[in-house]
């Protein structure tokens, strides 16, 4: 299972390498890359099964951000796991936001990785189509409400502008928190912005 790691933190790189080798992946199948351009070059030449990358490696640079977005689109058979940079906030979950893209906390455990990579580790060359994790999606109403919420509108403002009851707004907020698996507004905003950076945003169910 060819794997690439792009992370500035040596502890994370060592931890991931140790985890992968303990699960039977050979060291020569694990490649460390230092930049988005370097990752693009490697993905073009060998099409890795899994890529782990830290958002800090690209999110602050428009060019790197664009390259990562392009890489994810051009490699639909590769699973990309992006670690969020969240300072002093407890969040230990992971979310599938596209068929081949997961956004994860750095607090992810080996047990969590076993769940995510079970088919990869078992078959070594499986495709993302065999991932059993559900893909995060919001209803059109939830999506519209979330944008207003992120723009700083309170429940009463959202209620008035969307012409719905305040308790319905609260219910939608509860659904969003449940789907994103956190009650922390800062984490929700972070996940939404990161998803928008590298995709067209959280998927919206138009039905």
Swiss-Prot record:
Domain HTH luxR-type residue range list: 131-196
GO biological process annotation, one example: regulation of DNA-templated transcription
Any one GO molecular-function label of the UniProt entry: DNA binding
Disulphide bonds in the chain: none
Binding region for DNA: 155-174
Keyword check for Plastid: no
Keyword DNA repair listed: no
Pfam families membership: GerE
Cross-referenced CDD domains: LuxR_C_like (cd06170)
Keywords: DNA-binding, Sensory transduction, Transcription, Transcription regulation
Job of this protein: Component of the Rcs signaling system, which controls transcription of numerous genes. Binds to DNA to regulate expression of genes.
HAMAP family, per database record: RcsA (MF_00982)
Family: Belongs to the RcsA family.
Protein name: Transcriptional regulatory protein RcsA
Gene name tied to this protein: rcsA
